[in-house]
Amino acid sequence: MRLETHMDSDVTVLAVAGSLDSATAPDLREHLGQLVAGCGPVLLDLSRMLCLSSAGLRVLLVICRQAERNGTLLTLAGMPAEVRAVMAATGFLEFFAVADTVAAGVQALAA
């Protein structure tokens, strides 16, 4: 998994490329956990995510709850169909703000 961070209209965008599984979930938890600790709105760009395991789902939920406690807006964007299907089947989509594209997510968070 590769993580890349950049700013777009006062929104921190974290792009995830590759698989989010038990081997890579701790890296995302550490990196994203720091971002939602109070730096403003955060968009998680999942457009290059290849696979999402139960460990990845767990980390996303933990980070979602941390963002809520900190008052940080967190949006997931650009999910491939397979990733969206996993999140929908498990009910995880209900916990997150979701945007179809990164641009739409940034626009919503910057408003």
Q: Model-predicted segments: where are they?
A:
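General small-molecule cofactor/ligand-binding pocket signal
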Residues: 4-6, 77, 99
